[in-house]
């Protein structure tokens, strides 16, 4: 994997985490619009990361509300 791909994945990961945080805060996120121009491989990877971060953000918010 070349450096450009690593940087792209880091950027996509940052975006997935950011959109998941927004979703957990109650802000509407249209993930189809976000991933609309991505090729299938990147869209699949991004959506999996987004789902993981949504789950983590939701769990963190629940823990925050419990304490």
Curated annotation (Swiss-Prot):
This is Surface composition regulator. GO terms for biological process: negative regulation of bacterial-type flagellum-dependent cell motility; negative regulation of single-species biofilm formation. Belongs to the GlgS family. SUPFAM superfamilies: Glycogen synthesis protein GlgS (SSF109747). It comes from the Bacteria. Major determinant of cell surface composition. Negatively regulates motility, adhesion and synthesis of biofilm exopolysaccharides. InterPro entries: GlgS, GlgS_sf. The lineage of its organism: Bacteria, Pseudomonadati, Pseudomonadota, Gammaproteobacteria, Enterobacterales.
